Each structure stands twice: as structure tokens, then as C-alpha cells.
Amino acid sequence: MGEPSREEYKIQSFDAETQQLLKTALKDPGAVDLEKVANVIVDHSLQDCVFSKEAGRMCYAIIQAESKQAGQSVFRRGLLNRLQQEYQAREQLRARSLQGWVCYVTFICNIFDYLRVNNMPMMALVNPVYDCLFRLAQPDSLSKEEEVDCLVLQLHRVGEQLEKMNGQRMDELFVLIRDGFLLPTGLSSLAQLLLLEIIEFRAAGWKTTPAAHKYYYSEVSD
């Protein structure tokens, strides 16, 4: 994570005081309350799906900066605690705000993608991430395009890593996805297309073949 990337974080949607807090956390983590920083990032991620897509990169940079400066992991601990709280209340979150739920799944997958221990994804996040994806593959979620879209995007992003960590759960997830694809009603044509694409993407070793890319992406753009 090079220094210039610090200015690339999309933090313009925060108020000036919070922007300053985040900038300080990236440069001088010991000077701020890192638990507060973790809460600010999670709160904003649940409201802003654009930010939740790249919050993992910022969290990774703060964790690196804190470790380098003080050899501590206050921020990481605060972040994981808050992720766990939201995870435990995920059904309530989904019932309250579908957008908040989709943002949460995007965020936890983003964190899983970026956070590493000895260059391996964090084991503590594997089952929570799987549980979120399993929820997205339930029939009532598959009838909502934003949830199907989230499921497919996250599998594109972290599916291969997740399968390496627990292949059996990925097999079970794809049984649900295939069953969902065959649902007699309730699935839009776009949702069917997205599910078929992710089934073929995994079957091809988590790669899109040129022919599939041309077919699916011309269909989606139409």
C-alpha cells in the first residue's frame, strides 16, 4: 500500500471533521481514538454502498499504519467487534433496510478480501461471510434484484478465496443457487442471467471465458 494512495480514498461524503479524523488515522493512528474510527467507517459503510466497496482498502491501510507505529491492533479489534455485532443482528438489519443489508454484505466481503494474517484470509471471517451469502441465496432474497446483484458481485470478488478456505460450504451454496435458478416464479430475467453467469463462472475455475463475457455483458448492457 504505497503512500500516494492515501489521497485516493473516497471520503468526500464525510463531514469535514470526520474527513480529518480519517486522514489522521491513516497518517498518525496513535493520535486518534481508533475504536471511534472503526465505528465511523462501519456506520458510513452501512449507508453508502459506494464507500463500502472500498472501505476494506482504507481499513487495511489503518491497520498497517497502527501496527507499524505501535505494534498494536486496537483498530482491527474494534472493526471486527463491530462487524460481529452487525452480523448477529443481520436479519433485523435486512428487515429494516435492504440497502443497509446489501451494503453490510459488500463491506464484510471487502474486509475479507483485504485483511490478511500471514498472507492468508482471516479464518474468523470465513463463516460469517458464507452465512451472509447463504442468506442472499434464499428464495425470498433471489426475488430481489439488488440482493442477487450483491450475491453475484461478491462471489466474483471473493468466491475463489472462500472456496479455498472451505470448499464444502461453497458446494452447498451453489446447490442453493442452482435450486434458486430453477425457481418456477419470482425470478426476474436479469436475476436468472446473473445466476447462470456465476454458475458458469465457478464451473470455469472462477474465470469468465471470452465467449461468456461477450454473451452476458452484451445482454446486461442491452
From Swiss-Prot:
One Pfam match: MIF4G
One MF annotation (Gene Ontology) recorded for this entry: RNA binding
Localization (cell): Cytoplasm; Nucleus
Source species, domain of life: Eukaryota
UniProt cross-references to SUPFAM superfamilies, sorted A to Z: ARM repeat (SSF48371)
A single BP term in Gene Ontology: regulation of translational initiation
Keywords associated with the record: Cytoplasm, Nucleus, Translation regulation
Classification via InterPro entries: ARM-type_fold (IPR016024), MIF4G-like_typ-3 (IPR003890), mRNA_TranslReg/HistoneTransl (IPR051367)
Domain MIF4G: 3-205
One cellular component term from this protein's GO annotations in UniProt: histone mRNA stem-loop binding complex
Gene3D superfamilies reported in the protein's UniProt record: 1.25.40.180
Assigned protein family: Belongs to the MIF4GD family.
Subunit: Interacts with EIF4G1, EIF4G2 and SLBP; probably tethered by SLBP to the 3'-end of mRNAs ending with the histone stem-loop, it also interacts with EIF4G1 which is bound to their 5'-end.
Function summary: Functions in replication-dependent translation of histone mRNAs which differ from other eukaryotic mRNAs in that they do not end with a poly-A tail but a stem-loop. May participate in circularizing those mRNAs specifically enhancing their translation.
Record-given protein name: MIF4G domain-containing protein
Organism field: Homo sapiens (Human)
Gene (name only): MIF4GD
